[in-house]
Amino acid sequence: VNALKTLSAVGIASIFLLAACGNDSTEEDSAEAGGDINYSEEVDYTITGIEPGAGVTETANNTLDTYDNLDGWELEESSTVGMLAQLADAISNEDPIIVTGWIPHHKFLQYDLKMLEDPEGTMGESESAHTITRLGLEEDMPDAYKLLDAFNWELDDVEQVMYEAEDSDVETAASNWVEDNPDKVDEWTENIEEADGEKIEIGSMPWEAEQASAAVMEQVLTEYGYDVTVTEVDPAILFESIAGDSVDATVAPALPITQGHLYDRYEGEFVDLGPNLDGLQNGFVVPEYMDIDSIEDLEPKE
């Protein structure tokens, strides 16, 4: 009996020993797969960017110059299409990647992404898209003016239009959004009388979020009897056109930073109806599977 007890004790001890060894191995594997990854080295100390002339490109370069831990890093300038292709390829293989990004954008619906914290604030503070009109629009088209003044929506709304437009076109996506959101549209159009074919020109910019906002406004104004023209131009030309009364209104300008210099240049020559979309933000964006949360988590190139 004593011999059996001894054998049993030895067997149990062996089981615990084997289990402990197994746990050590599992923990090591987990560490190798998770927090011990040098993401800075994995992305070759490179931020994947977009066009050289874009505002986010300028702020990204400023960020590389500001953070000491980004010493030796480079911004790979490309195009928006090129950046999105590299992002899609990295995510399909669960590879690390850091890209210049902005909110709103349909990629946040398409993928699980996060924007890295920016303690120095070099990528810019959160902004809002504003509705501005030419002087005199309230007197000339009071109902259109009231509708423009009431226009307000959320990031999820504009990203939904942008996402759907990837597989169709922005006009179709905007029409579907208006049809699916009658309560919100009813808030904008409360006490608005239908027009009788009055012409109104909405200015926009050649980027997806701005196109989505303009397309939704075009859809609603058209349903209320206006003959709407949407014109896409460079931001500088847009502000000049509003100030010169050749464009009636826009829902596009990002303030106070991105188009702030144009706002200051023409201030007093237009009417600012205030924000229609809050939460616009530029930043460094990574997939959720990357175990970093801040720009300060990155390491300098040695």
PLM ranges: what are they?
Residues 16-20:
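C-terminal motif of bacterial Sec signal peptides marking the signal peptidase cleavage site
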Residues 22-25:
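Bacterial signal peptide processing site
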Residues 32-48, 134-136, 145-146, 152-155, ...:
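A conserved helix-loop-strand patch within extracytoplasmic ligand-binding domains
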Residues 36-37, 41-49, 148, 196-209, ...:
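Short, well-ordered beta-strand elements
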Residues 45-46, 50, 54-59, 142-189, ...:
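Ligand-binding clefts/hinges and TM-proximal coupling segments of bilobed small-molecule sensing domains
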Residues 75-86, 207-208, 229-241:
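Short helix-initiation/N-cap motifs at beta->coil->alpha
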Residues 85-91, 105-112, 214, 236-267:
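Pocket-flanking alpha-helical
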Residues 107-149, 274-283:
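Periplasmic-binding protein-like
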